[in-house]
Amino acid sequence: MQSSKTALDEIKEFLLCETPEEWIQAAIEHQDILLIDHANCEKKAASSAMQLIHRYSENYNLLQKMSRLVREEMRHFEQVTAIMKKRKINYIYVSASRYASELRKLVRKGEATQLVDLLIIGAFIEARSCERFSKIAPWLDEALGN
């Protein structure tokens, strides 16, 4: 018998708690800031993958995966900034949320544990992003909702 769980169900189980409704409302009401923040997150994800490439250059399996991730995240960055340009949203400074920085404080010292922790943190950040976009997608116009 096949499981009827969706990928989103699995993400919610992984995260253990859902994004507060207040965050959802703020994101819907301030889509310009949402787009700027999203562009920053895509750029940071690519940068984090590049840092792993530099730090763990002897790990060929990791190099291949991170290389693909850099390209994917930069393509997303291009897509978001193209939407911003079309909507005449200036790419202004928006401070980063504490979410990722607080998670990074938990990274253990030591090469083996540090890599594992960084990959797990990346998974949490990506899962949270997916969960949040699934919540706001019904409220966004077609260009952003897809």
What are these regions, as identified by a protein language model?
Residues 1-146:
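Non-heme di-metal
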